[in-house]
Regions:
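Transmembrane alpha-helical segments of multi-pass membrane proteins
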Residues: 57-72, 156-165
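Helix-loop-helix hairpins and the membrane-proximal interhelical loops
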Residues: 36-58, 62, 66
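Hydrophobic alpha-helical transmembrane segments
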Residues: 17-24, 45-50, 71-74, 112-116
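Membrane-helix interface segments
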Residues: 54-57, 97-102, 147-153
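Membrane-interfacial loop-to-transmembrane alpha-helix junctions, especially the N-terminal start
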Residues: 2-5, 55-61, 98-100, 223
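Alpha-helical membrane segments and adjacent membrane-interface helices in multi-pass membrane proteins
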Residues: 64-139
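Membrane-embedded alpha-helical hairpins and interfacial helices in multi-pass inner-membrane proteins
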Residues: 1-37, 77, 82, 117-123, ...
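Alpha-helical transmembrane segments in multipass membrane proteins, preferentially the mid-helix core
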Residues: 43-47, 132-144
Length: 236
């Protein structure tokens, strides 16, 4: 089922590429945000609902979503750590790709009720959801590890790379589109502008990836232990 899910994700990314090309040609850049929301998010919610999850799993995901939103808002208004992203990654690692996507997408939607909703919301939901899927597929529901320290360090390194590439890559592209959509000049998109956006986003992306990895190093092992205990106790 995980390979089928990965195939669905790759198909969605292909559809997004086609939609992006169409948006660039027609200069309807905000159309792509709607395509992301409808074509990239709804199918994943349908996949989750189709398999009829048990109440114990839904409660666990609701708790992880609440924790993710809580720590993300706490850090965003106090210390500059991206603990919310770390919680999404840990959820996908322990509970699988579907759970990782649900927690990631729903958490980002709820976070933006505090931080501000806008055309960037579906993009952020998609990127957090994709992070949950990626780590759910890579680590296959947090299989038992013999060396916890080595596992958490490896997870932190993988988180740094994935957050920088996936989150940074998608959100910088989204910023490029939204900037042009809101510009009164209605100018055409250029490759040079995209490269400038990516270059300008490198410091933030490095900070985001680095603080996410730091959060995993700080409390990743504890969260993984608790989630695996819940899996064993309740058969999730």
């Amino acid at each position: 089922r995980q390979w089928i899910l990965l195939g669905v994700v790759l198909s969605l990314l292909a559809c997004l590429a086609v939609a992006g090309t169409t948006a660039v040609v027609t200069k309807h850049y905000m159309l792509l945000s709607a395509v992301v929301l409808v074509g990239g998010l709804l199918p994943m919610f349908f996949v989750f609902e189709y398999r009829r999850p048990q109440a114990r799993e839904i409660v666990t995901l609701a708790i992880m979503t609440a924790l993710c939103v809580g720590v993300n808002e706490l850090c965003s208004h106090t210390i500059p750590l991206h603990a919310g992203t770390a919680f999404v990654i840990l959820t996908g690692t322990c509970l699988g790709p579907e759970a990782g996507f649900m927690v990631g997408a729903l958490s980002r939607l709820l976070c933006n009720f505090f931080d501000g909703q806008g055309p960037w919301t579906p993009w952020q939901m998609l990127t957090w959801g994709l992070l949950g899927i990626c780590f759910g597929v890579i680590y296959s529901r947090g299989k038992r590890f013999h060396n916890p320290v080595r596992f958490v360090i490896g997870l932190a390194v993988m988180a740094f790379i994935t957050v920088f590439v996936v989150y940074g890559g998608i959100m910088n592209f989204a910023a490029w589109l939204m900037d042009h959509a809101m510009s009164p000049l209605n100018s055409a998109l250029t490759k040079e502008e995209l490269l400038m956006v990516y270059a300008a986003g490198v410091p933030y992306d490095l900070t985001h990836a680095g603080t996410t990895a730091l959060c995993i190093l700080l409390f990743g092992h504890t969260v993984i232990e608790k989630l695996q205990r819940i899996q064993i106790k309740y058969g999730i």
